[in-house]
Amino acid sequence: YLLLLCLPLTLMGTGAVPPGPSIEIHPRIVGGWECDKHSQPWQALLTFTNGLDGVCGGVLVHPQWVLTAAHCIGDNYKIKLGLHDRFSKDDPFQEFQVSASFPHPSYNMRLLKLLLSDELNDTYYDEISLGADFSHDLMMMQLEKPVQLNDAVQVLDLPTQEPQVGSKCHASGWGSMDPYSRNFPRTGKLQCVDLTLMSNNECSRSHIFKITDDMLCAGHIKGRKDTCGGDSGGPLICDGVFQGTTSWGSYPCGKPRTPGVYVKIFSHVDWIREIIATHS
C-alpha cells in the first residue's frame, strides 16, 4: 500500500512514515497466514542496494520483467525472486539489478511528489484529499538478465477477462502485520491473506480518494484482513487468475467495510505487453 500522505521522499515506497493525517496509501498483510513455501513463485521483493530491505513487492510477468506499483519508484533497486524467508541465510533466491524502470505514463507523479513533499499545507491537502485520483499505479522494471525458471521462480500469466464481484481472492507480501504501525515492521516469511472482491460503488463510499474503473477493491465487511505497509506492488489473485496489484488503502489497515484498493490488471494488459515488446 502507499501510505498516502506520509511517505518521506527519501523513502518512496518504503512505507516508513512520519506522523500525519490518516490518509494513506500503505502496504502490508494483516490477518493472514504464512504462505506455503514457494506457493507464490511469481512473488518479487524490491530492495535498495544500500541495504534497506523489503520496500515493496512485485510480480514476475515475463522472464526479464517485474510489475510493481508506480509509487514504489526509486533509484538503485535490486529485485529478489524465489524468496520465502527474507531473514534466512539458507533460503536460496535469485537477485537482479534493475536495468530500466517504466512507470505508467498516466500515473499522477505530480500528486505523489506533492504528497511526499515537505511543503504540504491546507491548500495542497485539499487537492490531495478531495477525490484525488491514483489510477494506473503501475511500473514495469526490466531485470539486467532473464531469471532462471524453476519450482521457486515462475512467470504469472496476465488475465484474459475481468474478475467478478464476489470472487475469492488472495494477496501476498512481506509487509507489516500490525494494522496500526506507522513504522511498518515487516515479516520475515511471505504472508498470504484471503480477500473477497467488492464492488467499486461500495468501495467509493469508504474512501475519500477516487475509485475508478481501472481499480479493484478487495477485503471483508468485518475487516481484520488486508494488505498493508510494505505489500505494494504484490499480486492479487482471484479464482486462480492474476487480477490486481496492491496499491493503496486506509489507516489502520483492515478497517471494517473499508477494502484495500488494487490496480485492475485487465485494464493495463496492452500497456504491459507494449512495454515488453518495445524494450526487450
Curated annotation (Swiss-Prot):
InterPro entries xrefs: Peptidase_S1_PA (IPR009003), Peptidase_S1_PA_chymotrypsin (IPR043504), Peptidase_S1A (IPR001314), Trypsin_dom (IPR001254), TRYPSIN_HIS (IPR018114), TRYPSIN_SER (IPR033116)
Expressed in which tissues: Submaxillary and sublingual salivary glands.
Residues that carry a glycan: S99, N121
Protein keywords: Disulfide bond, Glycoprotein, Hydrolase, Protease, Secreted, Serine protease, Signal, Zymogen
GO MF annotation terms: serine-type endopeptidase activity
GO aspect biological process, one term: regulation of systemic arterial blood pressure
Cross-referenced CDD domains: Tryp_SPc (cd00190)
Gene Ontology CC annotation, any one: extracellular region
Keyword Ligase in annotation: no
Enzyme class name: hydrolase
Residue ranges constituting the Peptidase S1 domain according to the UniProt record: 29-277
pH profile: Optimum pH is 8.5.
Active site: H71, D137, S232
Localisation: Secreted
Regulation: Strongly inhibited by aprotinin, moderately inhibited by secretory leukoprotease inhibitor (SLPI), leupeptin, benzamidine, and phenylmethanesulfonyl fluoride (PMSF), weakly inhibited by urinary trypsin inhibitor, and Kunitz-type soybean trypsin inhibitor and not inhibited by EDTA and alpha-1 protease inhibitor.
Record function comment: A kallikrein-like protease. It preferentially converts human high-molecular-weight kininogen (HK) to bradykinin. Displays broad substrate specificity in vitro, with highest activity toward Boc-Val-Leu-Lys-MCA, Boc-Glu-Lys-Lys-MCA, Boc-Glu(OBzl)-Ala-Arg-MCA, Boc-Val-Pro-Arg-MCA, ZPhe-Arg-MCA and Pro-Phe-Arg-MCA. Has preference for Arg and Lys in position P1 and hydrophobic residues in position P2. Is not toxic to mice.
Protein name: Blarinasin-1
Organism field: Blarina brevicauda (Northern short-tailed shrew)
Lineage, highest ranks first: Eukaryota, Metazoa, Chordata, Craniata, Vertebrata
